[in-house]
Amino acid sequence: MFVADSRNGRVQVFDLDGRVKRQFGRAGAGRGELGRPMNLVIHGGELYVPEYFNDRIQVFGLDGTSKRVIGRAGDGRGEFRAPGGVAVAPNGELFVADFYNHRVQQLKADGTFVRQWGTTGVPGIRGGEFSYPTDVALAADGTLYVSDGYADRVQAFAFDGTLVTKWGGPFASNVFGPFNGWFAVVTSVAIGPDGNVFVADFYNDRVQKFAPDGTFLTAFGEPGDGPGQFRHAVALDVADDGTVFVADFLNNRIQKWRPRR
């Protein structure tokens, strides 16, 4: 398990029982250094690390060796302002949540721009617009799910860019709240082995689980620092067996949740 230890500017590696195996990276802007690493993804034996402070995606071997850098600071094509999450398609193309540019970019494996969703630099709450997108996840059927951070919703797109659905509060229109299917800032999204969608609901201190079409299924977690409690669930991932791992922001820990049978 690879964990973005953001404020320490490093990645820590654990086995699935929580034992530390190794770490790599240090705070900085050089090759092999990290500026606030965010939501990670592994593809093709490589680790893709979006760097919030360094405005780039850095690609590492699983041994921690820096292999290449994609993107640079800016608002042009293939440039980023605080990328928060990345997903990689089977063909190697990248989808990047470009936080301050209020857009999601699709890039070829070498970083060449393909297209974008959202209007650069302009936050919005209509379908296909974004207000500080934080993460992306790609389902097996090609559906792209975007955690639309301060719009308090999730948006789903077909691989060709068509908006499929959106959910979160009434009409998914930037209304936050504590109810099932509502959010108070969404910071991470992940796909389970059965295609269900898991969402980190930051200020509600919980994780919500949805069917692929956005139908609410269940939620877990509550405010606090005890087992099963969160002080802001900030990031998550789901293992092949359905186990959910959650980064518990202010509690400075990772929690492991077994799937309900």
Model-derived regions, located:
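Eukaryotic scaffold repeat domains enriched in small/polar residues
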Residues: 1-261
